[in-house]
A protein has these predicted regions:
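Acidic (Asp/Glu) and glycine-rich low-complexity loops/linkers
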Residues: 2-135, 141-155, 161-174, 180-192, ...
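Acidic (E/D-rich), amphipathic helical modules within compact regulatory domains
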Residues: 196, 215
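C-terminal amphipathic alpha-helical segment
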Residues: 216-218, 224, 236-241, 246
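Short, local alpha-helical segments
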Residues: 250-252
């Protein structure tokens, strides 16, 4: 290594150390608040919503969506996020509609943006006819304080968590986000993902359909009155103390494992995987098919 190369290496190392020292000094001055690195301004806006409604429709691009039961019986929308995010909320005619818009000019997309915007909808009632949500990258969380007749949620990369019961149909679709449903009862439950994970716990429903490509499906204490239908490409399927009148599971490379609450007539097929199932001849039909995955099912005591 010649002298000139050594000088350049020493200079580069010095600049790296200097950058680290300056960064640490700057963050210490901000009490290590990484939000201070952002170039955009944040704001909190509250929208008072007048009118009577029984249906709710929300269209969001990047904001997380949360719901709360209003403590004073009024409806309002509280939004926290960058100043370039605009919101429109109105309930002059059923349904209540909430929409989000990005008000930036093209040159304002250049900058440092820290944190996730969030909208919280405070609702005066606990029961509504319908909830429809279209979400891109934000997360959606619905607490068990509410109950709906129908629910339809679709998201691209956001995660969806629902703890609210639905009397008729609950349909949730996500591309790369995860889906969690817990402690609910519903008529028909439809859950679809591309690469996300699906967790359903402590749930009762009339029918359950779950489709997915590479995401796993976990069912824990899920009771389906009629038919449980699962289709997966490479994801695993797990049951824990679950039951249904009829079960159909089809996967390509995923394993199917778990326990059921009652005996079934098992019809299984796997090309290269192993099969371990109870030798029962009574109960509803449980059909499980996989190409390279294992099949391991037991009957819980």
């Amino acid at each position: 290594m010649n002298k000139k190369t050594k000088i350049w290496l020493i200079a580069a190392a010095f600049l790296v150390v200097l950058g680290v020292v300056l960064f640490a000094a700057g963050m210490a001055a901000q009490n290590w608040d990484y939000g201070a690195l952002g170039t955009g301004k944040n704001r909190t806006e509250t929208y008072e919503i007048q009118g009577t409604f029984h249906k709710i429709s929300i269209d969001s691009t990047i904001s997380d969506i949360a719901f709360e039961l209003s403590e004073n019986g009024t409806c309002r929308l509280v939004c926290n996020g960058p100043a370039y995010i605009g919101f429109d909320a109105a309930a002059q005619e059923n349904p209540l509609t909430v929409s989000e818009t990005d008000e930036r000019e093209w040159y304002e997309h250049i900058g440092i943006f820290i944190g996730t915007p969030k909208m919280t909808l405070y609702l005066p009632e606990a029961e509504y006819d319908a909830l429809v949500i279209h979400e891109d990258t934000g997360d959606v969380s619905i607490p068990r304080d509410f109950r709906f007749k129908n629910m339809e949620i679709d998201a691209s990369t956001g995660n969806i968590a629902n703890y609210a019961s639905v009397s008729d149909t609950m349909k949730i679709t996500a591309s790369t986000g995860d889906i969690r449903v817990e402690g609910v009862s519903t008529g028909a439950l439809e859950l679809s993902v591309s690469t996300g994970r699906v967790d359903v716990r402590d749930t009762m429903c009339g029918n359950l359909i779950s489709n997915g490509s590479t995401g796993d499906l976990t069912l824990d204490n899920v009771i389906v009155a009629e038919k449980l239908t699962v289709e997966r490409s490479t994801g695993d399927v797990g049951f824990d103390r679950c039951d249904a009148g009829e079960i159909s599971v089809v996967t390509d490379t995923g394993d199917v494992r778990g326990s059921l609450c009652s005996e079934k007539v098992f019809l299984t097929r796997t090309d290269t995987g192993r099969v371990q199932i109870p030798q029962s001849v009574t109960g509803g039909v449980c059909r499980i098919e996989t190409d390279t995955g294992d099949i391991t099912i037991s009957i819980s005591e």
